[in-house]
Amino acid sequence: VHSRALLALEARPVCVEVHLANGLPSFTLVGLADTEVKEARERVRSAIQNAGLEFPANKRITVNLAPADLPKDSGRFDLPIALGILAASGQIDGGKLVGYEFAGELSLGGDLRPVRGSLAMSLAIARPAHGTPQVLPRLVLPEGSAQEAALVPQAKVYRAQHLLDVVQQF
């Protein structure tokens, strides 16, 4: 699942990888995540359960935010982490997430809250690497963040108010 981390005024790509394994149940975040990102464990678990979806509590869950050397802060990774868990557990089709980038903080009930830097994310995807023709990724963001990201003319931005709004599309 793809997202972006803010580094000064840049929005650098981040890949959220999720692995579910048998063993002692746990939920581990790796990849230079700060305290606020590590708190995502409880927000994501509650949001998935309160949305009526199944949280794989009997599994060992490992979430990697790559690249590891890029600092990650804020709750912006809640939505991509939740989607990664839902895809890894077979509740949504992970293949349908290709071509999208996600960001959003989840409330315990599954509502999406705006995140900082959505304009930077939108600008970053609107400028593909020099000489590389490509299809621009589409952004899925909370309502307030989506309005800001939509200021970039070539950006394709989708708004969501709740985790279920996103899940129903994939």
Range-by-range predicted roles:
Residues 1-170:
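Peripheral, non-AAA+ core regions of ATP-driven protein-machinery
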